[in-house]
From Swiss-Prot:
It comes from the Archaea. Belongs to the UPF0058 family. Coiled coil: none annotated. It holds the Pfam family UPF0058. PANTHER family: UPF0058 PROTEIN MJ1205. SUPFAM superfamilies: Vng1086c-like (SSF140371). This is UPF0058 protein MJ1205.
Amino acid sequence: MHKDELIQLHQLLIYLRKYIEKKYNCDNNEFKEYDELNIYPHHIHRTKAEHIYTIFLLSSIIAKILSDNGKIPRSVSNLLRVSGEKIKKEIQRKRCKIKNTNT
């Protein structure tokens, strides 16, 4: 996907988050890890990889809430979380490589 498409998907997940928060009476602790990233769809200066990681993280949180309420299998949430962690490690690896190159 192109970065602009990822940003649109990210925004769609924000709308879904708001709907799920109302429907299932979620508190902000459910989305704490996502909120702490401080990467939102309007942050177009963020890298494509950062948006991808954020999308996977937000998707896995939404999937966990849905699986807790019997709407989808737990395996969906787990798969999204594992995929997100792989992307996070790749981002960290690239940042380390850039730091080592600059020093």
